[in-house]
Amino acid sequence: VSGSLSGVDRGHLLTEQANPLSERLDELPTDQLVALFCANDLEPQRALERAAPALAAAVDAIAARLASGGRLFYLGAGTSGRLGVLDAAECPPTFCTPPELVQGVLAGGAPALLRSSEGLEDLADAGQRDLEERGFGPGDCLVGIAAGGTTPYVLGGLQHARSIGALAIALACVSADQVPMPCDIDIRLLTGPELVAGSTRLKAGTATKMALNLLSTGVMVRLGKVHGNRMVDVAVTNSKLEDRALRILRDLAGVSREQGRALLQQSGGSVKLALLMAASGLELAPARAHLARHGPRLRDALDVCGAQLSGSPQPQGPQ
């Protein structure tokens, strides 16, 4: 990967081409402009469906690495990098993961979240350097995110990941025929030309966010962070999340809010441990030991001790 791709004509890339549907965008009445965007924003979902085999392969490969002590890194610049940071930041509260398990690495660091630092994306060695500063190693996973597939910062990081035996996953919105990327798993979300030519924060950004939602959630399901469709490892850190935890206990274990609150207090805020205690009758110490031995999936831990959750899962409404 060269240190810079300055002077390269990217006009042939799918993400840079002009969309014929929006040639007169500036002349459209507002209602027609909105309708055009609504219709065009169906493309990210279709792109995701076409990429389903690669996404499934990525979920299984990442989950296997994380189950063996590895970590997941998202690497990107601009919108792509910000989306990676956003997804990584949601994992600790949703799945009670340590913040270092899933990390978003953005060209330019934290200041680039608020102020554009797109010039930094042209430095291929910067991607490798930012990963090395975080101790990125052979047991880890990298998802390199670049809508147009040509970002040197991301390509340098992917090349480094492959060179040390880490799992390298590319995520781009152009075809591999147009732009090959160094990777083990290649996710291509072909959303087509943007309504504002080249503005990949639009459809490409939407598809990227959807893919990251799927990857992180799928991995956490595989790691036992979800029972049925409930986030049984939710971090109880505020009133809303405490309420959600109490409703999970009510719906799955059939306990009252008062009983649920007592169980949460006994379990140190662990919903999964509280559910096991409610279903099995085990006290805290043996329940914790049982979960450590037979988890992390609650279903497996329950099966081993012959316990069943007495509640019937109820749909959770929007919060």
Regions found by a protein language model. Give the residues of each.
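A short, well-structured juxtamembrane/interface segment
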Residues: 50-65
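Gly-rich Lys/Arg/Thr-decorated short loops/hinges at beta-loop-alpha junctions or inter-strand turns
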Residues: 15, 36-44, 104-115, 227, ...
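Glycine-rich phosphate-binding loops that contact phosphosugars or nucleotide phosphates
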Residues: 73-211, 219-223
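Short, glycine-rich nucleotide/cofactor-binding loops
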Residues: 44-53, 144-151
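Short, amphipathic alpha-helical interaction segments embedded in low-complexity terminal/linker regions
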Residues: 214, 219-319
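Aromatic/hydrophobic pocket-lining residues that form π-stacking "cages" and hydrophobic walls in ligand
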Residues: 61, 157, 215
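Cofactor-/ligand-binding subdomain signature composed of acidic, glycine-rich
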Residues: 2-47
